[in-house]
Amino acid sequence: AIGGSGLTDGKFEVPEGDVNRHSGPPTYVPARNLIFLSYAMGYAEVLGATHVYIGVNSVDYSGYPDCRPEFIQKFQALANYATTATAVEGRKITIETPLQDLSKKDIVLLGTKLGAPFQFTHSCYKGGEKACGICDSCKLRLRGFAEAGVEDPIDYETREI
């Protein structure tokens, strides 16, 4: 891991319960979505795919700069110049962000409608067997399920919203 983040480096604390923070969180992983999208675009080009999907969200989120619509738009513009598929062949690979403008509540409702296997998902920043229930990600997830009126099927150490 690169380090520099509460998710990848033990020198940093994972914040608990401050979902309304207005500064960059210590759980930000440097260039994470830049790296993911770079790999995904390369793989899409090899496969001949025309779309790459990423689950970024900028409504109820922890303030990561690479989850913002502006980042996705700029990366799309860069990708249009950076791959043979787009720059030479004229075959566009479009980045799709279906969760970008949805609240956590709306994401839970959509997932429920689509039959998403929520029991196999894990959002906790602390990475334990059970979700902690107190980190930002757990709080946002729990709040989304509560607002949607849907029972969150995963195990938590504590379930305080």
What do the predicted segments below correspond to?
Residues 47, 119, 133:
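Structured loop/turn residues at beta-strand edges in well-structured enzyme cores
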